[in-house]
A protein has these predicted regions:
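Small-residue hinge/turn detector
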Residues: 145-154
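Active-site acidic Asp-centered loop
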Residues: 154, 159-160
Length: 309
């Protein structure tokens, strides 16, 4: 199982991510054995639902534009946005392969952001920069704010650096006013239904503006995340507050996009690879892997060595 290859963030990282209060609450809810709900995944959804109720009051800020946010003048419009803070040359090899796949399968202009060129496109409010420098806003949270603001101002497609493409992005997505992948849990009312790892929006889109405003309002008033999937909570709340917007989003199930990452440690099979590519051309991977996954003959090794197309 791929879960065996994930690198754990440890207790120090857990507290740094959530803050002491949120870490204690989340840890107690998720891991105390006396909990009535024994299934971990169900318990996680219940925690996310609880977190969602804490975020919902911030919807009142969805029409309040962000102060201190600015953009240098340039002629950028509707590009693909990718961010790796230290530059792609310093990224793990799997990140580099993901970037190469986007270049191969995209006709849009691709803007590869890093900490050196970020100010050429966006300048975040001073309170955000201070909280980031103090370690209160994690890099993932910082990137969330960045993606929402960039998409609202310039439009385009945000693709996480861990996304691997095997086909061009469908026109149905590129022609939509707003798009997000859907995390389907069948009959469960999923509080993190819409993830942030692949988003598309037209310049000035109202939905992405509301998402941006709610996200910045949260960080104006908080110093830690209440839930790691905070952006998913915000996107889901905003989208569900407008049924017509949700109805217009082209349907794409994340189950298919998250299948390749589950078999990276498996023995490579051309038949299975062709099947995976038929399911979807957009694959969400991860760089948080143990070196043990680099065994010969695996899907991971084939991907890294460019031996699969």
């Amino acid at each position: 199982m791929l879960n065996d290859y994930y690198q754990n963030i440890g207790m120090k990282g857990f507290i740094q991510r959530y803050g002491i209060v949120n870490a204690v609450k989340r840890g107690a809810f998720m891991f105390i054995k006396l909990h009535l709900v024994k299934d971990y995944e169900v318990r996680k959804v219940l925690w996310q639902e609880r977190a969602s109720t804490k975020i919902k009051p911030y919807l009142k800020y969805k029409d309040t534009d962000v102060e201190g946010l600015s953009f240098p003048e340039n002629d950028v419009e509707n590009p693909i946005w990718i961010y790796w803070n230290k530059g792609i040359e310093q990224a793990p090899i799997i990140i580099q392969k993901c970037y190469e796949s986007v270049c191969k399968h995209s006709n849009q202009k691709i803007i590869l952001l890093n900490d050196q060129n970020l100010a050429d496109y966006i300048r975040l409010p001073e309170y955000i920069e201070k909280k980031k420098d103090a370690g209160q806003i994690p890099m993932a949270g910082y990137a969330d704010l960045m993606r929402f603001a960039l998409l609202e101002h310039y439009g385009g497609t945000w693709i996480d650096s861990t996304v691997y493409l095997t086909d061009p992005i469908p026109d149905m997505i590129l022609n939509s006013d707003f798009f997000a992948v859907r995390n389907s849990l069948l009959l469960i009312d999923n509080p993190v239904l819409y993830p942030a790892w692949f988003l598309h929006a037209k310049k000035g889109n109202k939905t992405i503006r509301e998402i941006r405003n709610v996200a910045f309002a949260y960080w104006l008033k908080n110093e830690h995340v209440i839930e790691y999937l905070l952006p998913n909570l915000i996107i889901t709340l905003v989208v569900k507050s407008n049924p017509e917007v949700e109805k217009a989003i082209p349907y794409m199930n994340s189950d298919y996009s998250e299948y390749l990452v589950k078999v990276l440690a498996d023995d490579y099979s051309e038949e299975k690879w062709n099947w995976i590519k038929k399911l979807t051309g957009i694959h969400k991977l991860t760089y948080k892997l143990s070196p043990d996954i680099e065994a010969e003959g695996t899907f991971y090794k084939a991907l890294i060595e460019n031996s699969i197309e």
